[in-house]
Amino acid sequence: MTGMTSNGRRPLLNRRLTEFGTTIFAEMSALALSTDSINLGQGFPDTDGPEEIREAAVRALRDGRGNQYPPGPGVPELRTAIAAHQKHHYGLSYDPDREVLVTAGATEAIAASLLALVEPGDEVIALEPYYDSYAAGIAMAGGTRVPVTLRPHEGRFRLDLDELRDAVTDNTRLLLLNTPHNPTGTVLSREELGEIAKLAVERDLLVVTDEVYEHLVFDDAEHVPLAGFPGMRERTVTIGSAGKTFSFTGWKVGWITSTPDLVTAVRSAKQFLTYVASGPFQYAVAEALALPDTYFEAFRADLRAKRDLLAAGLTAAGFEVFRPAGTYFVTTDIRPLGESDGFAFCRALPERAGVVAIPNAVFYDHREEGAPFVRFAFCKRTEVLEAAARRLRAAR
């Protein structure tokens, strides 16, 4: 019978998830361990965030704040801090009691948003390459993934707005955006976002915008929230995260801001995923969001220096480097090295050079588009990046 295994039973895994096996991150991290390589694959820092924020978490634990189930929408202190953050940095006003929802990291926020807002047969447009959980979330919701590809143009990966417009059909329910963009490091400009906003209003689309790298922008780049454009607040779910901004990725504290109706919809799905999460850490993140602007400026400056260090090392090793305007990833083209298959290159790199990277093709539906591109993370200590650069140059 169709869909049955050799023993006559249905496959154990839901068919919506059959394309999602072991992630490339697990595979490459295992390679890093077995070869004693420097892991520049997965995007997490190798140092903790501010000491005063760690101590805030310790105080919450000791004081018994959050050790039992916190409120479903998140503790009031954190919801208030998130609303204040959006007002301070972007001039966006949100009611902390009705328009803010705390989640178990941004990945749950993405999944809950898609499960709440997408029905089987709905089309969801995503900019490829994209964070791999987007594809899984769309699949679990029963939606149809429609990729619009960012392509290299004048040193950056660029969105073709005409291609985006052409991708919208009568079945399009939602745009899933990410800026600053992982893995390319592109930051969508105010002009690009303005055109996206016009399209969303014209075609009456919902938008889920993943802005977890909002404070990781460099040089002249500016992060502009899509929710601030005319007609967008009432149709946009904005996702944020403490992990990227404060270097506490293991705490898994994320959030959404949106209208009361959209927050209620997303909470309806979220409550059956983790119910609640990260109680004591929520109090610490509330304090982190209130850190002075000097913290965010110093954080950006530190990452900018690390970006420049790794980019220079990769260039010296023969890669073509796409200098990122945001995030903590740098995408490279391996064709100047005489290579064209990112998968094969990354699987061989630990033995050849003692460095781990990620093939960008895993972030594409159209794998051939991403075949020659490889991603490195620069959210590591300076001495680690220097050692990686030396190894890559030596293996050239």
Describe the predicted segments one by one:
Residues T2, D166, A348-A357, V362-R396:
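PLP-dependent enzyme catalytic core of the Aspartate aminotransferase-like
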Residues T5-R9, N14-G105, A112, D160-E163, ...:
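N-terminal small-domain helix-loop-helix segment of the aminotransferase-like
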Residues N7, F229, R233-R304, G313, ...:
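Conserved core segment of the aminotransferase class I/II
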Residues T35, A141, E202-R203, A317, ...:
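Helix C-cap/helix->beta junction micro-motif
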Residues A116-I138:
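Conserved PLP-anchoring active-site segment centered on the Schiff-base-forming lysine
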Residues V146, L150-D219:
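Active-site phosphate-binding strand-loop segment of PLP-dependent enzymes
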Residues A286, D302-A311, V321-I334:
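Conserved glycine-rich beta-strand-loop-beta hairpin in the small C-terminal domain of fold type I
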